[in-house]
Structures are given as structure tokens and as C-alpha cells.
A protein has these predicted regions:
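Beta-sheet entry/capping signal
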Residues: 82-83, 110, 136, 204-205, ...
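Cap/insert and terminal regions of metallo-dependent hydrolase folds
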Residues: 88, 100-110, 116-118, 123-131, ...
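A structural signal for short, well-ordered beta-strand segments and their strand-loop junctions
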Residues: 137-140, 197, 206-211, 348-352
Length: 414
């Protein structure tokens, strides 16, 4: 089989915004099922992580211009064929990029859905699998859907080709190349949380879905392809014009990270309704794209220090939302899962969001879960977690979700 190692030509960045993407190559027909930005228009960037072995495919997604990367990883099998971890939207462009790999390395043999709760991962799998009719789909156990729990076949998964990942990773046909371990399911009453981490032994690469991220100081390449969200959030007031500068892109990205990680950090205030409306009236851009001039954000002067405390130079991090709302419901199970992974041999992590490649050791991976055991200098500031703590209390005090257990674990350690 001929191997062409040439890079796929990438698209040049558009001026500002996805509204200018008219090509059918980027069209995602099922966008209304999960109507989040960029809706029906999704670019894909393919990057070769390890020559002839590992590739990432980045798209973007978000709400109210709080946009982050979402990532699929493809690994070449030692024999012939490809394994796909966490598919993204199978646009014409995306599938063309995948088929270039198929021509060189063989067909897509396995498609992995590593989560049960992430709609942004789940709803791509069925349409993606239909593009590769010989692939077997493996899903994390205990799949569910909301508001009605439907069979996977009703959600577009190919019934005859979809299997559940067994607890024992030796029972799958790719066990000679991969290990995996399953976290969960963590009962949240409203649903469950589960994640399957994969280890590609030959390349010493760990694949995770949502559990670990690394926050970069500059916007990832796929985010730079659509600059308007960056520039929208870079402003300090609705009265400011939207200006495309490198400084503004970085500024907007850092604020987007604070939004996506904390919802509302301690350095963000909400102006009065009167001020919001007055500023909107005086905004130089009252278009629908700019939300008619509405900009309900008032960043404090020290906002950038909050980003630095969050990023900590790109160290592996468990997202604050998982820390405050999910993993603290099952601290012992989470730590056992993290301990299992820390016993594996790897030197890099590919997550489904934010930084595409994290150079990290098993010890550094395990340290990211220290928040479940004790407070330390690595912990995130409590003042920035306050909004998430308040949401948590609103949910568990009436019994909507189970109460957190991590605090009890810390007290027991003392």
C-alpha cells in the first residue's frame, strides 16, 4: 500500500467569522440536534502528531461565542487499518481528510465512543459510522439519553455493528495494541457520568475525553480560524469597536477559558441592566452577530491573574466543572481509576478539548486528581469556584443530585 507522507493542505483563515463559510465541504446537516456554535458550518484541521501513526482532527464548538476545540484522534493499527477515538462532525472536508489516511493505511476498523453523557461526542458517532460501513463501533457501557432514554439504534448508531466495551480490555480485538480503563458510571440522579481512557502502548500515548485538559496561553489553531468570538470577548465594553489584533485574540482567548472553566469567575462582574442597555445603544456594532450590542460583562483589572492561576503554565488539569459537580460524587472510584492510569507507561496525553497534545508523565496525570484528597498549592482558588459551588448546592440540597463525597474524604485523611 503506497504511503504518501505529504501534509494535507489546510484552509487559509477567513477574515473574522464562520458566516463567510459557504462551501458545502464544511456543512454539518444534523446541527439542529445539538444547536451550538458554529451550527451548520464546521471546519476541520488535521495534524500529524506522530509520523505515520497518530493524527488529530480539530473542530470548534461553543455557546455565546465561548468556543473551544473538540477533537477526534485516529491511530494507525500495527497490522492494517485505523482506530478512531471520539469522532467529530463528519463533514465532507473531515471525511475527505480521513479517507486520505484510509488510502494509505487501510480502512477504519474501530470507532470508539469514550463517554456516555457528552452529547457533543455522542451525536457525531452514528453519522460518522455510516461513512465507514465496515467499522465496528465500541461504546462506553451504560449509555443513556435525555429526556427519554432511547436505544442507541434510535440515536443513529448502526445496530449490527455497535458493541459495548467490556470491563476487561483483553476481550476486544485491538487488545494487543491498546489498554483501556473505565471510570464510572458515576450516578448523578439526572443521569450518569462515565469516561474510557485509552493507552496506545507502542507510542506511549494516553487518550482521554473530558477528564484532563491543559489550558494554553494562546488560542489553538482551530480557534484562530474563526476570530470573531476571540475579538468579541476581548472588549472591556460594548462601546469598544471589534479590532483584530494579536493582543486582542490572546486577550479574548484567556477570557473564553475563564468562561468555559468557571462559568463566572471571581474577576467577572455583571453590570446593571441600565448600563448594559445604555452601552448597547452606543455600541458601534448592533448587528445580530454582535448580539445587538449587548455585552453584560465587566472584567476586573486583575482578571488576567485568574487565568494564570487556572492555566499554571499548561499543567494537566481536571476541569473545574468536573471537580465541583461530578467527580466529587465518586472520589474513591475516580482515584482508583487515576491510579490505574498512573501505572501505565506514557509520555503524552491527547484530550478531546483545549491543548491538542500534553507532554506529561503518569505522575503529573495523577497529581491532577489531588483535589479529591487534600488542599494544596495546586488547588484552584475557591473564590473562582464559588459560582460552581453555588450551582452544586442548588442541585444537591433539594436532592436533585447526590451530595458531594470528596469533602468527607479529605476530613477522613486528616
Amino acid at each position: 500500500m503506497k504511503k504518501d507522507n505529504s501534509r494535507v493542505s489546510q484552509i487559509e483563515p477567513n477574515d473574522l467569522n464562520h458566516d463567510r463559510l459557504d462551501s458545502q465541504d464544511y456543512y454539518w446537516r444534523f446541527w439542529a440536534n445539538v444547536p451550538i456554535y458554529p451550527y451548520s458550518k464546521r471546519r476541520t484541521i488535521r495534524r500529524e502528531v506522530l509520523p505515520n501513526t497518530i493524527w488529530t482532527f480539530d473542530q470548534l464548538q461553543g455557546i455565546f461565542y465561548v468556543v473551544v476545540p473538540i477533537r477526534m484522534t485516529i491511530i494507525r493499527l500495527e497490522t492494517v487499518g485505523l482506530l478512531v477515538y471520539a469522532p467529530v462532525a463528519p463533514t465532507r472536508q473531515c471525511i475527505a481528510l480521513v479517507r486520505e489516511l484510509v488510502e494509505q493505511y487501510g480502512e477504519v476498523k474501530y470507532i470508539i465512543l469514550p463517554t456516555i453523557s457528552g452529547l457533543e461526542h455522542k451525536y457525531f458517532v452514528g453519522p460518522f459510522a455510516r461513512k465507514f460501513p465496515n467499522a465496528t463501533v465500541y461504546v462506553a457501557p451504560n449509555q443513556w439519553s435525555f429526556p427519554v432514554d432511547l436505544p442507541l439504534s434510535w440515536l443513529g448508531f448502526p445496530a449490527k455493528r455497535t458493541k459495548v466495551l467490556p470491563e476487561d480490555s483483553k476481550q476486544v480485538p485491538f487488545s494487543d495494541e491498546f489498554d483501556y480503563t473505565i471510570l464510572g458510571d458515576i450516578d448523578l440522579k439526572l443521569g450518569q457520568f462515565e469516561e474510557v481512557a485509552f493507552l496506545h502502548r507502542r507510542s506511549q500515548t494516553l487518550l482521554v475525553a473530558d477528564s484532563i485538559v491543559s489550558i494554553p496561553k494562546q488560542p489553538p489553531e482551530i480557534i484562530e480560524q474563526d476570530r470573531f468570538p476571540l475579538l468579541f470577548h476581548a472588549r472591556d465594553s460594548a462601546r469598544e469597536p471589534i479590532k483584530d489584533t494579536l493582543e486582542n485574540r490572546i486577550k479574548g482567548w484567556k477570557r473564553i477559558c475563564l468562561f468555559s472553566m468557571y462559568f463566572r469567575s471571581s474577576v467577572l462582574n455583571v453590570p446593571s441592566i441600565g448600563k448594559i442597555l445604555t452601552d448597547a445603544w452606543r455600541s458601534p456594532d448592533k448587528s445580530s452577530r454582535a448580539y445587538w450590542g449587548l455585552f453584560p460583562f465587566d472584567w476586573q483589572a486583575n482578571w488576567e491573574s485568574a487565568f494564570d492561576k487556572l492555566s499554571q503554565n499548561g499543567r494537566p488539569l481536571v476541569a473545574p466543572i468536573l471537580q465541583a459537580l461530578i467527580l466529587n460524587r465518586a472520589p474513591l472510584e475516580t482515584l482508583e481509576w487515576a491510579d490505574t492510569i498512573a501505572g501505565w507507561k506514557f509520555n503524552k496525553i491527547i484530550p478531546c478539548h483545549f491543548t491538542p497534545l500534553i507532554h506529561a508523565t503518569p505522575k503529573e496525570f495523577r497529581q491532577a486528581f489531588d483535589f479529591l484528597e487534600s488542599s494544596s498549592h495546586r488547588s484552584l482558588p475557591e473564590e473562582d469556584l464559588e459560582t460552581l459551588r453555588n450551582i452544586d448546592a442548588l442541585l444537591y440540597k433539594p436532592g436533585i443530585v447526590p451530595p458531594p463525597k470528596a469533602e468527607n474524604l479529605r476530613l477522613k485523611d486528616k
